[in-house]
């Protein structure tokens, strides 16, 4: 590794402390107050149970609910909290160059974190596998002659088998007040002794990163430090573990001075100045987001924490109420607010979707994804909306279970509302973030001379012709309405989870409630009707990723 790409961790920490000293404050009294409240208010038998859960090799939804419930109790007992607040950064206090640098680093950090949560190396998988998949993997490893992962070794696999992995977000951070309360109660040590011990650890942290050897030497003076242990894996360490990192953070928060990063307070009024200072430190020491998967370096750490929440103490506060990740909670708007000359601002809702197509990177991504379409496989197409104003398009290949399914914000909102009542039942508000330009890009990328099946071809033919795709051939199966809808309920029962956009009540001309029309469901319904049976799909997936289908209008989401 070249010197220019060497992470000089403590040197970076010291530089960040110098640059951000005006954003730090004395939080010692507040931390001790919160620790006292936790000592008096927490059920430590439940704390012990959660610590046991965090030692399990496989954890499920019940375990997660137990952790989240205890976290909620902690949240209700403390004053130091970070709140969920979206932060939109525009050119102004931060220059366009600084915003672009910030955007690039957040994107790199996102990629690094996602890789660390789902690494490919055998035996170090950190994502969500079901119990059945884990057992099956063990059998496969034995078949191919690979050893079963050592359960007690470093890099132990601990997996959350949960239905909604987003509920794991922001549930594992350490808090000085919680660390102190657990140390005092569970080691039967007075809180004042814990404060003194951690303060000494914090003083050491002003000149170096404390390690286990330092800890061993300090134990003679402070026996309570004996509860601190080395964590073999940093995967999902909770606030209830006695890790060295948690203890060092607590020590830093207890110092009256030292300009410790742990005492930074971020507010809407100072967030841009704080980020500007962070970027200033980055430039001075050539800090960067490392490609290496693992613990975050000091620059990555402060970047993530500050962008996660727009209000609160990013290092030491309770953040379990925050929704989303750093790249979701910080958005960058690089558009100019200066109106065009002689161009009156349109009334809200009157101009339709923003006239912005795909970016170059999105176009290249779509081109790669569309390469997975089999041009010779039987393929269905269906649309919702008008041919000149479609709001939903689906292309489905039953042989391999793959499909293209996306949405479009309508131009004619009055017509959309009529169609919603009598056909698709979609909510206009749900389409505001649909990616503009996707319809033309997808249709333009379909293989040359492809043959598509449909039930009713007039609107689809007009849509294809409007995109100069007269080479694409249509086969209209021309079933009766009754025959075409025969498998409607069965398809919705089995595959309805694939689309959650049809939320309204739909009535026919006789004002009788009917099932909303979904372009994707209709493709599967027509396939079922034509074969007189439900398709047996081993796998089913949309080749378009969610962040290509949706985006914030005029805003780049990081």
UniProtKB/Swiss-Prot annotation:
Effect of residue 382 to A: Decreases interaction with host IKBKE, defective to inhibit IKBKE kinase activity and IRF3 activation
Listed name of the protein: Nucleoprotein
Family membership noted in the UniProt record: Belongs to the arenaviridae nucleocapsid protein family.
Keyword Zinc among UniProt keywords: yes
Organism: Lymphocytic choriomeningitis virus (strain Armstrong)
Keywords linked to the UniProt accession: Capsid protein, Helical capsid protein, Host cytoplasm, Host-virus interaction, Hydrolase, Inhibition of host IKBKE by virus, Inhibition of host innate immune response by virus, Inhibition of host RLR pathway by virus, Interferon antiviral system evasion, Manganese, Metal-binding, Ribonucleoprotein, RNA-binding, Viral immunoevasion, Viral nucleoprotein, Virion, Zinc
Region entry Binding site for the cap structure m7GTP, spans: 54-237
Highest taxon in the source lineage: Viruses
Residues reported to bind Mn(2+): 382, 384, 522
Site (Important for exonuclease activity): 459
Impact noted for substituting residue 517 to A: Decreases interaction with host IKBKE, defective to inhibit IKBKE kinase activity and IRF3 activation
Effect of residue 384 to A: Decreases interaction with host IKBKE, defective to inhibit IKBKE kinase activity and IRF3 activation
Positions with a binding annotation for Mg(2+): 382, 384, 522
Domain notes: The N-terminal region is important for the cap-binding activity while the C-terminal region contains the 3'-5' exoribonuclease activity. A CCHE zinc binding site is present in the C-terminal region and may thus contribute to the substrate binding and/or the specificity of the exonuclease activity.
Residues annotated to bind Zn(2+): 392, 499, 502, 518
């Amino acid at each position: 590794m070249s010197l220019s790409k060497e992470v000089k961790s403590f040197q970076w920490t010291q530089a960040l402390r110098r640059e951000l000293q005006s954003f730090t404050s004395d939080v010692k009294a507040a931390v001790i107050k919160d620790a006292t409240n936790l000592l008096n208010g927490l059920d430590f038998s439940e704390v012990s149970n959660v610590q046991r859960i965090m030692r399990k090799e496989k954890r499920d939804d019940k375990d997660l609910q137990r952790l989240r419930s205890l976290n909620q109790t902690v949240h209700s007992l403390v004053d130091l909290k970070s709140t969920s607040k979206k932060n939109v950064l525009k050119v102004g206090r931060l220059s366009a160059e600084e915003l672009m640098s910030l955007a690039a680093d957040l994107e790199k950090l996102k990629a690094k974190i996602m890789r660390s949560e789902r690494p490919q190396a055998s035996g170090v998988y950190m994502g969500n596998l079901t119990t059945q998949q884990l057992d099956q993997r063990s059998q496969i490893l034995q078949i191919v002659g690979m050893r079963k992962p050592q359960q007690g070794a470093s890099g132990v696999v601990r997996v959350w088998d949960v239905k909604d992995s987003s509920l794991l977000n922001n549930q594992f951070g350490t808090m000085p007040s919680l660390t102190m309360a657990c140390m005092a109660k569970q080691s039967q040590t007075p809180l004042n002794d814990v404060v003194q011990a951690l303060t000494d650890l914090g003083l050491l942290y002003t000149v170096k990163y404390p390690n286990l050897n330092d800890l061993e030497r300090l134990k003679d003076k402070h026996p309570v430090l004996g509860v601190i242990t080395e964590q073999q894996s940093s995967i999902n360490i909770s606030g209830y573990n006695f890790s060295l990192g948690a203890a060092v953070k607590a020590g830093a928060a207890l110092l009256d001075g030292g300009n410790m990063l742990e005492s930074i307070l971020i507010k809407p009024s100072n967030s841009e100045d704080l980020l500007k200072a962070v970027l200033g430190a980055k430039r001075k020491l050539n800090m960067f987001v490392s490609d290496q998967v693992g613990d975050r370096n000091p620059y990555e750490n402060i970047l993530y924490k500050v962008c996660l929440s727009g209000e609160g103490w990013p290092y030491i506060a309770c953040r379990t109420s925050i929704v989303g990740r750093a790249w979701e909670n910080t958005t960058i708007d690089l558009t100019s607010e200066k109106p065009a000359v002689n161009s009156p601002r349109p009334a809200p809702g009157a101009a339709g979707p923003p006239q912005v197509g795909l970016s170059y990177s999105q176009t290249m991504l779509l081109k790669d994804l569309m390469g997975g379409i089999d041009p010779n496989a039987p393929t269905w197409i269906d649309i919702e909306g008008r041919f000149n104003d479609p709001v939903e398009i689906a292309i489905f290949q039953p042989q391999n279970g793959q499909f293209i399914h996306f949405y479009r914000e309508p131009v004619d909102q009055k017509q959309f509302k009529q169609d919603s009542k009598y056909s698709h039942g979609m909510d206009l508000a749900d389409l505001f973030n649909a990616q503009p330009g996707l319809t033309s890009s997808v249709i333009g990328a379909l293989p040359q001379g492809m043959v598509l099946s449909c039930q009713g071809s007039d609107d689809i033919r007009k849509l294809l012709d409007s995109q100069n795709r007269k080479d694409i051939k249509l086969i209209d199966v021309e079933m009766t309405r009754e025959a075409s809808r025969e498998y409607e309920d069965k398809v919705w029962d089995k595959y309805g989870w694939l689309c959650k956009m049809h939320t309204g009540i739909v009535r026919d001309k006789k004002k009788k409630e009917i099932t909303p029309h979904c372009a994707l469901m209709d493709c599967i319904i027509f396939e079922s009707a034509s074969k007189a049976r439900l398709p047996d799909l081993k796998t089913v997936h949309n080749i378009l990723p969610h962040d290509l289908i949706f985006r914030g209008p005029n805003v780049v989401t990081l």
